[in-house]
A protein has these predicted regions:
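Enzymes that bind and transform nitrogen-containing heteroaromatic metabolites
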Residues: 1-173
Length: 173
């Protein structure tokens, strides 16, 4: 069985919405997009490169897929482990609304997402990585399918926005 590993950028108060840019996700009138950018340093970049180098396949929610698919297919892959991984590995996309995917290597998850992800985990191989995709991650956590949770915490408090661990989260350790 291969491990399912989640990587989330989060604030001190648990916000995971739109870390990369002001227009990344304005759902609910969120106006703080790009909050991670001032804190992204070479050390974090090197860590992200190392994590992406260990991926065999990706598992993405619809929103994260759409954000990634708008940016990464055009990115040069030479000397960029993140772009290389995103553009050459399979991307399994969990969505109830998408019917087709344009990004090379992207595949829709069919049927029940928990059963489909369990089947993906049951395969031999390297890491199945989830990046962002907070709604999907919440589903995976409830189903006890996450083997490792990597939280990259930025020293900022936003007070609003989508949180990975909101009201009604099942207590666990």
């Amino acid at each position: 069985m291969r491990p399912l590993v989640v990587t989330e950028f989060t604030t001190l108060d648990g916000v995971v919405q739109a870390p990369g840019g002001p227009d990344e996700d304005t759902t609910g009138g969120f106006a703080h997009g790009g909050w991670l950018v001032p804190f992204f340093e070479d050390t974090l970049g090197a860590q992200m490169d190392a994590w992406f180098a260990g991926v065999e396949d990706f598992l993405l929610g619809r929103g994260t897929y759409e954000i990634f698919a708008a940016a990464w297919p055009q990115a040069p892959t030479e000397d960029d482990p993140v772009a290389e991984a995103l553009n050459t590995r399979t991307k399994h996309v969990a969505s109830r609304t998408l019917t087709s995917l344009d990004w090379s290597g992207a595949r829709l998850v069919e049927g029940d997402v928990v059963e489909a992800v369990q089947a993906l985990r049951d395969r031999d191989g390297g890491e199945l990585q989830v990046h962002g995709s907070p709604g999907l991650v919440q589903t995976l956590l409830r189903a006890d399918l996450v083997d490792e949770l990597r939280l990259v915490v930025a020293p900022v408090v936003l007070g609003e926005g989508e949180r990975l661990f909101g009201e009604g989260v099942i207590p666990r350790s």
